[in-house]
């Protein structure tokens, strides 16, 4: 039975690989962030949402069906034992199998339904239309607005910051900041010289053990790589900022006290720690 249990775990893990998990996490976050976006729109703000993948969406890796097992492809070679465990699993975890959690659509599909007329910036959108979408977002006359930006397409070359003070900017990142330098570029779309209101930046966190593991391992490795490439103290500050942000995850609602505050103070403290040699 132990070998058959390992076979079932292998079946699930093969269905639920790294990329599939990232798709699912992003789909869940896209669904959960919708009420937060609506709150900010109601306050007259313009909202930027970054996502990692154009495709994706949820699926249920735990919806297992009985199957014919190739003895050479399994550790136990016992189809009856494997299918027996699958039947037990389906009975004990029927609520998990039927959960709506796994039915979420990709961010693009979901947002096009929830926010008709949403502005898109991604590789599937012609360059001319992307420029028009950015211009419309930046136009105060368009009012509170949502723009959905795919990470690679929007990491540089576009400005989405508030230059007039009429519509404060909010940025939600549905992906994981697995590339610190890219995350900095994304934040720079609304947080840069010339902004006249505080930029509000939020990273979504599902709180799952898998996301904690993915965040901890990837950020530690890549931020350290940036450090080793010569960024020194500043790279360490970037890594610390991401870690503290992840640890401080919470249900921050629109309009809360201190919203959009504190980032510059942290940046200054990090900058003050840099030696003249590092400068």
Protein language model regions, located:
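Short, surface-exposed, charge-dense and proline/glycine-enriched linear segments
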Residues: 74-94, 151-158, 228-238, 266, ...
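A conserved SF2-helicase RecA2
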Residues: 178-278
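Conserved helicase/translocase motor-coupling segment
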Residues: 1-64
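Conserved RecA-like P-loop NTPase helicase motor core
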Residues: 85-225
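Low-complexity, serine/threonine/proline-enriched polar segments
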Residues: 63-117, 250-257, 266-269
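Residues at structural and domain junctions
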Residues: 7, 19, 97, 146, ...
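Alpha-helix boundary/N-cap detector
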Residues: 3, 8, 28, 76-80, ...
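Generic hydrophobic, helix-prone segments enriched in Leu/Val/Ile
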Residues: 12, 21-28, 69, 86-89, ...
